[in-house]
C-alpha cells in the first residue's frame, strides 16, 4: 500500500530535509519512525527538499509498505516515535499513481520578517530579525515583476542542480501584520535558494536602498552576483503543496501560527 503524510517541522536542529552522512536530517528521523511502525524498512519521498534551518507546516511525503495499518494508526504511531520538532498532521492511503514530488502542481512558501531595531526573545528561531524600517508596499510592488514563467537565474544558487532556471510564479504578496512582514509566494516549483534570494533583494527595496524597478532589472540580467545576499533560513516555511483534486488529500491551515490562510 502507498501512504501519504502531511508533515510539520522546526528546521533549526537539522541540516535540511535530505538524509546525509553524519548530520541530522528530517528525512532520517521520519524514515526511522515510519520503519518502526511498519516493522520494515521504508523509504520516503517528499514534495520539496528544504534547506538547513528551514521549517515546514505543509510538507507532504509518501512511502510504500506491506504493513496494513489504519490511517489513524500511521499518524499517531509515527508521531509517537518522532522528536518533538517533527510531527505528522495527517495520514491518507493513496492510489499507486500518487507521488509526493511528481504529482505536485505547486509549492507555497511564507517568509516572516520581524521588523524591530531590537531583537525579540520570542520565536527567535522561527522568524528573521530585521532592524531596518521596511516599506512592505514597495516590496509588494517590486515583487510583481516576478510573476509568470520566467528565467530565475538571478535568484538561483550557484550549486543548484536543476536542469532549467525557468519557473512559473503564481502569486507573490507582501503584507504586514504589526511588527511582522510576510512574503507569501507560490510557484510550480523553485530553484535552489530562490525564495530566500528573492526576499534578500526585496529587503533592499523595502529599505529604500534600491528602487522598485530593480527587481525586474535583476530578473532580466540573469546574473546572481548582481542580487542581494541570501536571506537567512529561519524565517522561511514551506506552508502548502498543491495536488490534483483526484487525490483528495487533507488541507490544513497554512500558518505558521497566527497567520490566516489568505493574506489580504
UniProtKB/Swiss-Prot annotation:
Task of the protein: Formation of pseudouridine at positions 38, 39 and 40 in the anticodon stem and loop of transfer RNAs.
Species per Swiss-Prot/TrEMBL record: Pasteurella multocida (strain Pm70)
Gene3D superfamilies from the UniProt entry: Pseudouridine synthase I, catalytic domain, C-terminal subdomain, Pseudouridine synthase I, catalytic domain, N-terminal subdomain
Gene Ontology MF terms in the entry: RNA binding; tRNA pseudouridine(38-40) synthase activity
Similarity section: Belongs to the tRNA pseudouridine synthase TruA family.
Active site feature: 51
InterPro entries noted in UniProt: PsdUridine_synth_cat_dom_sf, PsdUridine_synth_TruA, PsdUridine_synth_TruA_a/b_dom, PsdUridine_synth_TruA_C, TruA/RsuA/RluB/E/F_N
Protein name as annotated: tRNA pseudouridine synthase A
